[in-house]
Amino acid sequence: MNFYKKKPVVIFLMGPTACGKSQLAICLRKYLSIELISVDSALIYRGMDIGTDKPSFSDLYNHPHRLLNIKDPVENYSAAEFQKDVLREIDEIIKLGKIPCLVGGSMFYYNVLLHGLSILPPSNIKLREYLIQKSYEKNYLYKKLKLIDPISASRIHKNDFQRLIRALEIFYLSGKSLTELKKKNNYKLPYNIFQFAIIPPNKEWLNNKIELRIKKMLMLGFQKEVEILFLRGDLHKNLPSIRCIGYRQMWEYLEYKNSYKDMFNKIIHATRKLAKHQLTWLKNWKNINKIEYHSTSTILAKKVLDVLEKNDFSV
């Protein structure tokens, strides 16, 4: 296919969890000269495959995903690191004469890529230690941020301690909220970006799809996967990796803090909340092409290709 005439093209494939984003991305490789980049804050971790629903070994062998399996679960990975890494990968793919195709459901990462990060104060060890201690008080960080910066609070889950701590840290160090600092940002990407989002047919369908995925996850040995992490000894449930949905709930089950049934129900509840959060992001997202879900990836791919063809592409 021919590239867009002026700027290099980048494709975003977004959507709530369990809507077939990865399958669509793989299918598009039949029609477009694309390279895939994962945009998922859970898929970055090695040894966390079942609970994150990573593409199969066969799919990854035939359709490699960049920014996948790049961190050990004990390591942190900031939005700034993602921004740096993804821009590097995008430029490398463009130099190969191909189109970068970003696929995943981490809406905050997409937002960082599109709008950038303001020049933010570096982390302060003493302040961070204080905020970490306060994180043990139920909802303290979230309530505090809601008073200081309600816009940022609306975009951060109340249990996402890493982002809550960073947002509060920025305010205490700079005297300005994260939202205020972002408004001063003149960041703009030098690409022609086509954004697509798979939209589920209805809430009931998505809820059923999520429950089926979690049942499959447990059948595939998710408990054993978390047990291996649990027995390492260097991991704990306040790490970003173990706070990933499913892992935290299974971790607490292994600590005898809830029953198997409670663990299962909590994973379902947390996953449904995530999907709702993702859909809220997408509802207010600008310049997005929404495509209705279809069980056949080829039909979804055709919808993507139709949009591209209308914008001076020849496929």
UniProtKB/Swiss-Prot annotation:
Stretches the record annotates as Interaction with substrate tRNA: 40-43, 162-166
**Which residues does the annotation say bind substrate?**
T17, A18, C19, G20, K21, S22
- Cite the NCBIfam families for this sequence: miaA
SUBUNIT field: Monomer.
- Coiled-coil residue windows: none
Q: Where does ATP bind?
A: G15, P16, T17, A18, C19, G20, K21, S22
Keyword field:
ATP-binding, Magnesium, Nucleotide-binding, Transferase, tRNA processing
Which top-level enzyme class is recorded in the Swiss-Prot or TrEMBL entry?
A: transferase
Documented EC number(s): 2.5.1.75
Key word tRNA processing present? yes
The protein's role, per its UniProt record:
Catalyzes the transfer of a dimethylallyl group onto the adenine at position 37 in tRNAs that read codons beginning with uridine, leading to the formation of N6-(dimethylallyl)adenosine (i(6)A).
Q: Per the entry, which co-factors are needed?
A: Mg(2+)
Q: What is this protein called?
A: tRNA dimethylallyltransferase
For the site labelled Interaction with substrate tRNA, the residues are: S106, R128
- Say which species the protein is native to: Buchnera aphidicola subsp. Acyrthosiphon pisum (strain APS) (Acyrthosiphon pisum symbiotic bacterium)
For the biological process aspect of GO, one term held by this record is: tRNA modification
Please write the reaction equations for the catalytic activity of this protein: adenosine(37) in tRNA + dimethylallyl diphosphate = N(6)-dimethylallyladenosine(37) in tRNA + diphosphate
Q: Which family does it belong to?
A: Belongs to the IPP transferase family.
| GO MF annotation list | ATP binding; tRNA dimethylallyltransferase activity
